[in-house]
Amino acid sequence: MADTSLVTMVRRNWQRATIALFLIALVAGFAPFGAVASLDKVASYFGHHTSSKSLQSVVGLSGSQLGIGLAVLRLASLGALPLASLADRWGRVSTMRRTLLVGLVITSCAALSPSYWFFVACFALARPLLTSTATVVQVVTVELSNAQTRIDRLVIVSAGAGVGAGLAAIFSGLLRGPESFRWLFALALVPVFFLRPLLRSVPEPVFRGAGGPLARLGAVPQGLRSRVATVGVIVFVIGVVSGPASGFTFVYGEGVLKISPLIVSLVVSLSALTGLAGLLLSRYFARTLGRRGTIVIGTVATALTAALAYGGGKTAFVIGYMSGVLAGGLLAPAIAALSTELFPHASRATAAGWIVVAGVLGAMAGLLVFGLVGDSVHVTGPGSLRLAALVTFLPLLPCLALLYRLPESSQMELT
């Protein structure tokens, strides 16, 4: 059992480049998640409470406004495609440096928001930059690893993204006051001063035979298009589930169920343990069941735990949220591995960009459906969003069978 221990895994893979990629993933996870973590406070500050038994009467903005705002943020992530494609031209490290720097600066501008839609606009401008950074981090992690260490390092990098999102949620709970969200957004400026020394530790991946002619920006070789499309459908389904599963979490927990922000912060902190368990399970399942089986289990678990969180009271929310973090930890490394291992170096970042597009479209669809169904029911308390959860999360799960049209990538050597 020693080989499966957390300490052994970290010690074996904790090199300077891996540490740097972990921290970059943390920062790229922290900045955009501030929009989700503070959404209840933003809605309450900029919205208007009504007397009707609707979501707006509880949180200040309607489900449609919240859903459209979150969908706009997801739509903006489509810009990650050309930005990630630039990594196949400019190089991985140079692209990460530029996109992360600009994305953090724009995120911090949201601290000056005079309205809800200005807040949405700032995060929408920053979102593609930070999404492309996270995408290229996964690509670099895979390219600097071999078949034996790849999933371990993806687990570590996924942990970084999870820690970043968790820190955003914790700070949101600890910062008090109606305008405390402004301080959270301003924190995005802090990492800017450490980017250059951090990125010096990351070597530029080089592959033999990777110096051929470049295709048009965003173009994928014809022989790989069906593979990109299949992975895209899978990621679309994951997006439909994960978009509203995370997007409305804090609105429902703090706004509808009236859970104290400090309690929410405590739940998020404890969820670090379940998230870690999910990452370790992902490492185990990705090697025993393969990437495809792990993705199926993780996606179904995400849908079921989110339905539990939105379908009951405070206890169901806490259990659903914490088990949902476990499901997310189980899913993230496996889908990151599959999305990068199936493609050659020359088009890997571009393919990853198209896969991000599919996830964005899925998340937008999920958020819009969830918001519209949520508006159609009386939001009076526990379980009010149960119907929205079931209608959104469950219908597309059979599409996961398409995974078995793809080759198992766990033992593939990168080209």
Regions found by a protein language model. Name each.
Residues 68-84, 269-281:
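Central cavity-lining transmembrane alpha-helices of secondary-active solute carriers
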Residues 35-37, 225-279:
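Extracytoplasmic gate region of multi-pass secondary transporters
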Residues 39-79, 262:
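Extracellular/periplasmic helix-loop-helix junction of adjacent transmembrane segments
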Residues 101-114, 300-313:
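C-terminal ends and interior cores of transmembrane alpha-helices
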